[in-house]
Amino acid sequence: MSQLTLTLLMIVSAYLAGSISSAVLVCRMRGLPDPRSEGSGNPGATNVLRIGGASSAAMVLFFDMLKGALPTYLAYLMGIDAISLGLIAIAACLGHIYPIFFGFKGGKGVATAFGAMAPIGDDLAICLMASWVVLLLISRYSSLAAIITALLAPLYTWWLDERFTIPVAMLSTLIIIRHKDNIQRLLKGEESKVSRKKRPKNP
C-alpha cells in the first residue's frame, strides 16, 4: 500500500472516529439532557460539567482526547510523515466538530486536538494540561483557557520536539477559528464562566 493511500485511509478513519460524540453518548447512558440542546448547546466536556457534574465530564474528556490520540499515534507508528499526521489529527477534530453520526452538530474540538498532540510526548501533554487547568482556574473561562493554550501549543512543541511544530500549529489554528464566536463574546464581556452543576441538598 502506498504512503498516499495509507494516509487517505487514516484520514477517513480519523474522521469517523472523531464523529463518535462522547458527550451525547455519556449523557444518554447517564440519563442526562442532550448537551446539544442544554446549557451552552456545545457537546463537549465543559458543557457536560455544567449539566451533569464532574464524573460525567471526566468521561467525556477522556474519550474525546482518545479520539484524537488513537488515530494520530497509530499513523505515527505506521511511519506517516509529520504533515500528514497533522492532516489526520485535523480530520479527527473535524469529525468531532461535524460528526456524520450526529447530524453534523458537534463540539469545539479542543479535547480531541489536545489528545492528538499528547502522543508527541508526556512533557508536551503535561504542559498543555497544566496550562489549560491553570488558565481555567484563574479566569473561569473554558474558552479563554483553550484559546491561550492553543496559542502556546506550537511554542511548547518547538521547544520540546520541533519536528511536529507545523502539525500542532495547524491544530491550534483550527481551535482558534472554531472559537471565533467565543472571542467576540469575551471582548464584549458576554462569555459564560464555567460552573459545576449544583446537586440538590438532602432534606
From Swiss-Prot:
Keyword hit for Transferase: yes
InterPro entries: G3P_acylTferase_PlsY
Protein's cellular compartments: Cell inner membrane
GO cellular component, one term: plasma membrane
Single GO MF descriptor: acyl-phosphate glycerol-3-phosphate acyltransferase activity
Record key words, sorted: Cell inner membrane, Cell membrane, Lipid biosynthesis, Lipid metabolism, Membrane, Phospholipid biosynthesis, Phospholipid metabolism, Transferase, Transmembrane, Transmembrane helix
Single GO BP term: phospholipid biosynthetic process
Topological relation to the membrane, as annotated: Multi-pass membrane protein
EC number: 2.3.1.275
Annotated transmembrane regions: 6-26, 82-102, 118-138, 141-161
Pathway: Lipid metabolism; phospholipid metabolism
Record keyword Transferase present: yes
Catalysed conversion reaction: an acyl phosphate + sn-glycerol 3-phosphate = a 1-acyl-sn-glycero-3-phosphate + phosphate
Top EC class for this record: transferase
SMART domains for the chain: G3P_acyltransf
Family from the record: Belongs to the PlsY family.
Protein task: Catalyzes the transfer of an acyl group from acyl-phosphate (acyl-PO(4)) to glycerol-3-phosphate (G3P) to form lysophosphatidic acid (LPA). This enzyme utilizes acyl-phosphate as fatty acyl donor, but not acyl-CoA or acyl-ACP.
PANTHER family: GLYCEROL-3-PHOSPHATE ACYLTRANSFERASE-RELATED (PTHR30309:SF0), INNER MEMBRANE PROTEIN YGIH (PTHR30309)
Self-association state and partner proteins as the record states: Probably interacts with PlsX.
Protein name per Swiss-Prot or TrEMBL: Glycerol-3-phosphate acyltransferase
Protein species of origin: Shewanella sp. (strain W3-18-1)
